[in-house]
């Protein structure tokens, strides 16, 4: 369903998909962002963001709500953008939020990004979004440039998807020890 659904959504006007197989089969532009597991597999949130910016400098979209959006996520994103992207002259970047009070958090994040000189940084929102939720958060004054809409776009309401979240609980170090 995801592969054909991504194609149908693209025909209907969606800009792209996180489903890379739809890109390979149908030419639907693939794009996306990091997962919470990416952030958690590093010793620090900043290290995860910096590494992502180094690996994907022209498409850096950082997931800023793994721990604390306003106290660490956005500040660490700004630091990574400043240290990795700005020296290369790259101004195209984004942050993504997929939990919490999206309207409030995006307003605060926009102010923080603007004050740090990242007016060009886009803000993306996701988290089981549909047209009603999007309309509601926009009515609340959310500062969202992009919406990541997936399951509610291509899944029948009468046969919904399983609403689960995957987060990394531990990693195995090179010496074989398991670290929570």
Regions found by a protein language model. Name each.
Residues 126:
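Residue-level recognition of the GNAT/N-acetyltransferase active site
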């Amino acid at each position: 369903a995801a592969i054909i659904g991504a194609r149908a959504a693209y025909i209907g006007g969606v800009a792209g998909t996180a489903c890379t197989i739809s890109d390979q089969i149908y030419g639907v532009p693939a794009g996306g962002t990091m997962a919470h597991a990416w952030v958690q597999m590093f010793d620090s949130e900043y290290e995860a963001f910096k590494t992502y910016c180094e690996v994907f400098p022209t498409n850096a979209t950082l997931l800023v709500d793994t721990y604390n959006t306003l106290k660490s996520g956005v500040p660490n994103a700004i630091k990574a953008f400043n240290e990795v992207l700005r020296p290369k002259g790259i101004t195209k970047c984004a942050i993504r939020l997929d939990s919490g009070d999206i309207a409030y958090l995006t307003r605060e994040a926009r102010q923080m990004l603007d004050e740090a000189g990242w007016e060009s940084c886009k803000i993306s929102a996701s988290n089981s979004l549909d047209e009603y939720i999007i309309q509601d958060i926009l009515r609340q004054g959310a500062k969202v440039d992009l919406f990541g809409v997936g399951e509610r776009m291509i899944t029948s309401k009468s046969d919904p998807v399983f609403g689960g979240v995957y987060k990394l609980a531990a990693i195995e170090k090179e010496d074989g020890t398991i670290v929570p």
